[in-house]
Amino acid sequence: MSSADAVSQNTQDAFSSFRLAFVQGQSLATTGNAVVALPILNGGIGGGSFILRRITVSNPSNTAGGTVPSLATANVTILTSSDGNTSNAVTTSGGQTLGNVTAANTWQDLTLASGASTTAYTANALFVKVGVAVANTAVNISVFGDVVSF
């Protein structure tokens, strides 16, 4: 029989589809590069690498209170650099609209760039570039993937 704490002894590189990064209540009300930083493993990836599997935008909220505004016109790109250089995009480089994030309790997986299917990334953080903002909005962003090494 296995030990009851066997799973707790494993690390992220022993599991697939681990949540690599998460930010809660991040504003999409302002355009710009690196509006939101997504530190990988809370900044603990060190010299390792990871494979991206999914990036989910969820739980929209109205920062001014009241009904959640539709984010259907919001446009975001996720990058490995904070300079806005779209050659470093891990999602669609031209940005992706959040057409499914239109009310409370809605979510959307972002389309990963073609390079994400064959690349193990080493960046310590990912960055959100907001191309088109929506006033008084905030969302949660989750990044899922596999840790290749620490």
What are the language-model segments listed below?
Residues 2-150:
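Surface-exposed, low-hydrophobicity beta-strand/loop segments enriched in small/polar/acidic residues
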